[in-house]
Amino acid sequence: MKDFVLLNDKILPNDVKCYSCCTTMDLIALVTKDDQIVIHRFLTWQKLFTINHMSTTINDNNTNNNNNNNNNNNNNNNDNNNDNDKSNKSIVSIQWSPNGKMISIGCEDGSIFIYNIENAKLINKSHNHKHPIHKLAWIKEVSQQRSQQQQQQQQQQQQQQQQQQQQQQQQQQQQQQQQQQQQQQNKNGSTKCNNNYVSPPLFLSQIKQNMNLFPSISYYFENSKEENIYLGGDIYDRPFDILICCDSIGVISLLAFGLFKIVTIDLLSLLKQKYSNTHFLIKPSKSLKILDITLTESLNKLSVMIETDNGLFLSVTIDTSILLEKRNEIHEISLQYFLLFQLQQSLDIHIKEITEKWKETQQQLSTKWVEFEKVLSDYGFSSSIEQELIDLLMCGVPSPPTNQFIVNNINIKKLKLTESNCNSIREILIKYILPSFLNIFHIITVLHNNSLENDGYKGLLDTNTVKNILDYCGSFGMRLQSLETLICGIESHYTSFFSWLYKVQCTLNEIQPDRKLSLPFNELSIMSLLKKGLKFDLLFSTSTLFSSSSSSSPSSPPSNNNSPTFSSSSSINNNNNNNNNELNQSGNIGFSNNNENLEFQYKDLKGNFHDLFKDFSSKIFETFNEITIVLPSLFKFENVIPFCLYDKNDTSVSHKFNCSLISHPNDTIYLSIYTTLSNSNRLFICKREDKLNWSFTCYQLNEKYSILDCKFYNNSSLMALVSEDIIKANQKKSTRKNTYLKQYQYKTDDNDDSDNREYIKLDVNIPQSTILLDLLDSFKSREIILKSRISPITFELSTSRKISATFIGKRRVALYDLAEDEEEEEEGEEEDICLVR
C-alpha cells in the first residue's frame, strides 16, 4: 500500500472557518474567523495576499447609504448598521472558479460576492437568497462530442506510433503524412466542435466588436482608476460555466459565470407539490439541507443529495437539458448582461462625479448669496438679492447695500470657477456618460432584434418587455442628451452674469478692468437668470429639465410612491410664462421648445434627474427577467429516491451519514454514501445510468472503522477520511483513534465506462441486510495519528493539481500529494507518520 507524500504541515495563526482548494492552480483560500480571505500557495506556503471582506462590505454599505440619503445627514445609525453588516455578511462558504481566476463566497445573509484573484478586486455582488449560503459549486461546461473526439484522437495517435515502429525505413515520409493527417483531423474536429461547443460562436467576436463601437467607452475601460469596476476581458474568452448556490433551506440558484442569475429552484416546495406521495416524511418537512450537488459537464442533469428536517435522506435528479439546448443563447445573454452591468457602473460613477462637482459649485455660490442677504438685512432692506440686482441692471445705480457687497465681497476669479466646473461637467458628459448610455442602448437594441428574429431566444427574452425598455431608454437618452445643451446654457448665463458684475465692480472702484476677465455679456441672459433665482438649481431642477407636459402613458413604468411629485411643465409655464419666454430667447434653459417637439417621448418620465436615473438603472435590467422565469419552468424532475431515514428525536444513538456526488462525461452519476443507519458499517456506491433507476454496490467496513468524510477524486477512485478505534485489551471502549486518508477505487478504469462490479437495482431504500460484494480496502493511504483528540477533521481536494488539504481542528492544515508514484513499492513497506489523536 502506497503512502501519500506530505508536502506541508502548518499551524495557522488564526482559526479557519472554511477553505477551498483551487482545482487548476497551486492555490488554497482560507477564511479566518474575522472573515479575511487569505490566499496561499500549496508547495511553498507563500502568502500571496489577503482580501478584507468586511471592509469591502462596510464601504459598499456606506456608499449605498450615501446614495439613498443624498443630502440628508442620517449618519447616527451608521455604527449600528456596520455592526449588523458584520454579522449578516459573515462568510459561511467559499468556492473557486474553474479557471482559478475568481473566487466566490457565500454569506450569512444570503449574499454572494465574487472576487478577482489577480488583483483582489470585488467583481460582483448579488443577493438572490434570504438565508445563509450553505454550499457552492462551480461547474465548467464540457461538450460530450468534444471529449469523444479527444479520445478518438488519442487512439489514432497510438496507432500512428505503432506504425512508426513497424516501418522504420519510411519514418520520415510517414511523419510528414501523419502531421498532415493530424492537421486535417484538428481542423475537422474544431469544425465539428464549433457547431456544438460554446467557445467559438460568432456572437463572441461580435460582442467584442460592439465594445469598440464608441472609442470613448473603450478608452475609459482601459484607463479607469475606479476599483469597483471589473474590467477583465477573460470572461469573453473562457468556456461557459455556472456557479451553483444553495442556501440553508434548500433554495438553489444558478449563476452564469457567477455573475448573472439564470435559474432559481425552491426544491422543498417543488418536492411537496409533485412528490409528496413518494414518502410520508416529505409533506410534513419544513426545511431541507443540501448535502451535495453536482451538474453534469454537459449541462444535462442536476443531481442533489438532501436531508429533510425530519430525518429523511433523498436523492433528486433534475433534467436540465434546456441549458444544453439553449446554451449559446444563454451564453450570449449572460455576456450582454455583464457588459451592460459594466456600463451601468460606469454611468453611475460619472453621474455621481458631475453631481458632486455641481453641488460644490452650488455651495460656493450659495455662500456668496447668503453674504449678500446678510448685508441687505444689516441695512434694513426687505427686498431680495435678485430684485436688487435687477434694479441695478435696469437703472445702472446700485443701492447702498448692493454697492457695499459688489465692492467688498465679490472675488471675480473665484466666481469664474463656476464656469470651469460647468465646462468640466460638460466634458465628463461628452466623454463618458453619453458613450456609456449609447452602448447600453445598443445592447438593448441587439437583444430586441434577437428576440424578434431568432427563434432560439423565444422563452428567454420577452419581446414586448424588451421593446418597452428600449422605448424608455430612448426617452431617457433624449433627456440625457439635452443635459449637455443645458450645461452649455448655464455656462453662458453665468459667464454673462459674472462679466457684468466685474464691470460694475471696476466702475464702482474706478479701476481699469482686466481684458482677460472683461468679456461681453448679454443683458437678456442676465435678466432671465435673475428672474429664475440665483439659488435655483438650474441643472437638476425638475422644472427646468425633466418636467412632464402631460400624464404618463399606459406603457409607462409604475411611479414610485416614495419619490417626490412635481408640477407639470404646463403649470410651470402658467406660473412663469414671462420668465420662460425670456429664458428661451436668451439661452433656452427651460427647453420648452424641445419638450414640445419630443412630447411623445417624455410622457413616461417623471421626477428629478436622480429619480429618473435610479429608475433607468433598475429598468434596464428588467430585460433579463424573462429568462429567470422561463428556464426553471422547463426543468423536469426525473426521479426522487428516498435512501434512508432516522429518528432525529432519538439522541441515544449517534448516526453517521456522509455522501458525495460526481458526474461522468456520459452523464452517468455516481453517489457514494457511508451510513450506520442500516445497522451495518458499509460504504455504498450508487450509479445512475438512466432516468428511472439507480443501482448500487456496497463495501463492508471493519467494525472499528468509520468514515468521517468522503469525496470523489476522479472518474475511478474516491478519497475518504477513515477513523480507526484503538481498543486496548483491558478496555471496553476506545481511548484513542487513528485517522487515515485513504484512496479507494470504485471503477476499474478512468477512461473506460464499463465496470466489472455487480450493481443491484435500488428500489426504495438501502436494505437492512445486503449481500457482501467486496471487502473495502484502499490501494493508497496515509495514516494520521493525532497527539490529542482534536476535531473536526475535514479535507478538500484539488483534482487537477492532485493535492489534498486536510484540516485538523481549526488551525492545523496538512497538504498531501495524491499523484501516483512512478516506481512501484513493495507490499509491506509502509512508513506512516503517526500523529496521536
Swiss-Prot record:
Parts forming coiled coils: none
- Tell me if Cytoplasm is a UniProt keyword of this record: no
Query: Any idea which UniProt keywords this protein has?
Result: Cell cycle, Cell division, Mitosis, Nucleus, Ubl conjugation pathway
Please give the chief subcellular localization of this protein. nucleus
Family per record:
Belongs to the APC4 family.
* Cited function: Component of the anaphase promoting complex/cyclosome (APC/C), a cell cycle-regulated E3 ubiquitin-protein ligase complex that controls progression through mitosis and the G1 phase of the cell cycle.
Q: What is this protein called?
A: Anaphase-promoting complex subunit 4
Organism in which the protein naturally occurs: Dictyostelium discoideum
